[in-house]
Curated annotation (Swiss-Prot):
Region (Disordered): 1-38
Molecular function (Gene Ontology), one example: cytoskeletal motor activity
Pfam family, one: FliE
One Gene Ontology term from the biological process aspect of the record: bacterial-type flagellum-dependent cell motility
Keywords: Bacterial flagellum
Protein name stated in the entry: Flagellar hook-basal body complex protein FliE
Gene: fliE
Organism: Helicobacter pylori (strain G27)
Length: 109
């Protein structure tokens, strides 16, 4: 009969590979989470800044119309319409996000 060896040196290369792979997966998973979270927040901030700029242009166009300083009423109307449409879109996106969040809260585990 052959003697059973309790020699762990035979398994050590495999255990090192397993540990290395686990560490790499954890690092890549953390990097993925940070990357995705960062992208969404950047996208959200960028969208809000664009909406703010559009609203400011609309306000300036309205002020120029009120004071008679504007030369092209058509461009002012376009700026105002663009701001109105952008605000409606942002509100709908917000409403959908809130609705999805509420749906998640109702989900039973």
């Amino acid at each position: 009969m052959q003697a059973i060896h309790n020699d762990k040196s035979l398994l050590s290369p495999f255990s090192e590979l397993n540990t290395d792979n686990r560490t790499k997966r954890e690092e890549s998973g953390n990097a993925f989470k940070e990357q995705k979270g960062g992208e969404f927040s950047k996208l959200l901030k960028q969208s809000i800044n664009e909406l703010n700029n559009t609203q400011e242009q609309s306000d300036k166009a309205l002020a120029d119309m009120a004071t008679g300083q504007i030369k092209d009423l058509h461009q002012a109307a376009i700026a105002i319409g663009k701001a109105e449409t952008s605000m409606k879109l942002m509100l709908e996106v917000r409403n959908k996000a809130i609705s999805a969040y509420k749906e998640l809260l109702r989900t039973q585990i």
